[in-house]
Regions:
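Donor-nucleotide binding loops and adjacent catalytic segments primarily
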Residues: 33-36, 41-43, 178-268, 369
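C-terminal amphipathic helix plus adjacent low-complexity
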Residues: 327-370
């Protein structure tokens, strides 16, 4: 059984889901954490992923309520389905599904384990620690993430590094990305716009941070007179509407795009500004100029290769960063090395084999079933 609930999970697990569907009696579950069409269903269609076998409608009015709903609804489903193993990815509320599986002695596997930003104000940091320390088998992307898990006392024999799945995903859908007509549809020219994506609670909810974001977007649109395309997460749009924000004409708010269209925009933008956790990986793999709109991160391996610059919402730092990025060679003309742990071509094969290899191991060693 694989449990998903948000767009990043669906994207990163797309090839793993296909592999598990081919080789196992696979059950796909969507918790409904972010069941907005633009955020979820459009990605199932664009990535050619089948619809989930179960949709749990677990979204609550708060993070705590959502986690509680996920735990209780998944627990009931586990009784019904009786899966041999459970797989989750990342650090979302949907990953709390690992708790009832653990309680029922079902082997649990966690992809993207070991990420740490060392800032407990970040909600995902809390979930990471809970899930990492609950999972039977942790599958980090990098050597650094693996070292964090060992430092926290987790057994090395229950940690298997896989590398990031995103290279395999991007390669599989490359033709679709190349064929995207999104620039023409939006009336954009290559290299003549900025692309922005921001949705994190710490950038949207506090008044001070949100005010800085609004100032940044307006300043960016005035600096070069270029369109600023903002892929607007529902949380961000809700905050904008509630605050009655007025943006400059060049700031264009658009609904979340398909995977193919969004990556086409990233490849062709003058620069991408994002607070997404995936920006470090995508900018390293695809080699486009990128700024991380955060004050902390959980991917030091990306910083070691300078694949992205971390600037927060500081307008001066953003402008300074953009001046540097304009000189960055793009595409195959690299000046920055691709992060080694982001270049794995066969992560879906690894994950399939790890699950099949360790399910019986966990039953025997952890649960003493035989």
């Amino acid at each position: 059984m694989t449990v998903v609930g948000t767009r990043p999970e669906i994207i990163r697990l797309s090839r793993v889901i296909a592999k598990l569907d081919t080789h196992t009696d696979h059950v796909l579950v969507h918790t409904g954490q972010n069941y907005d069409y633009e955020l979820n269903e459009i990605f199932f269609e664009d990535l050619g992923i089948r619809k989930p076998d179960h949709f749990l409608n677990a979204a609550g009015d708060s993070g705590a309520e959502t986690m509680g709903n996920v735990i209780s609804t998944v627990d009931k489903l586990l009784v019904e389905v009786q899966p041999e193993a459970l797989l989750v990815l990342g650090d979302t509320n949907s990953c709390s599904s690992i708790i009832p599986a653990k309680r029922r002695h079902i082997p649990t596997f966690h992809m993207e384990a070991g990420n740490r930003c060392f800032d407990m104000r970040v909600p995902e940091e809390i979930i990471r620690k809970i899930v990492d320390h609950t999972a039977d088998i942790n599958m980090p992307y990098s050597d650094i993430a693996r070292s964090y898990l060992i430092r926290e006392g987790l057994s090395p024999d229950m940690i298997v590094k896989t590398g990031s799945p995103i290279t395999e995903v991007l390669e599989h859908y490359k033709a679709r990305i190349d064929a995207s007509n999104v620039l023409a549809e939006l009336g954009l020219k290559e290299g003549q716009y900025f692309l922005v994506s921001t949705h994190r609670e710490e950038n949207i909810e506090p008044d001070v941070a949100f005010g800085r974001l609004v100032t940044l977007l307006n300043t960016l649109s005035e600096a070069d007179g270029l369109p600023v395309i903002v892929s607007t997460h529902p949380r961000t749009q809700k905050r904008i509407d509630a605050a009655g924000v007025k943006f400059n004409d060049q700031v264009r708010l658009i609904k979340p795009l398909s995977f193919s269209d969004y990556n086409k925009l990233q490849l062709c933008a003058r620069a991408v500004l994002s607070d997404s956790g995936t920006i470090t990986e995508e900018s390293s793999i695809l080699n486009f100029p990128a700024l991380n709109l955060r004050e902390q991160h959980e991917r030091p391996e990306g910083m070691e290769e300078a694949s992205v610059m971390m600037v927060g919402l500081n307008v001066e730092r953003v402008m300074q960063g953009l001046e540097i990025l304009v000189h960055q060679p793009r595409g195959v003309e690299r000046s920055l090395r691709q992060v080694g742990d982001y270049s794995m071509p066969n992560v879906s094969d690894k994950v399939l084999r790890i699950i099949l290899s360790y399910t019986d191991y966990v039953n025997r060693v952890v649960w003493k079933k035989y």
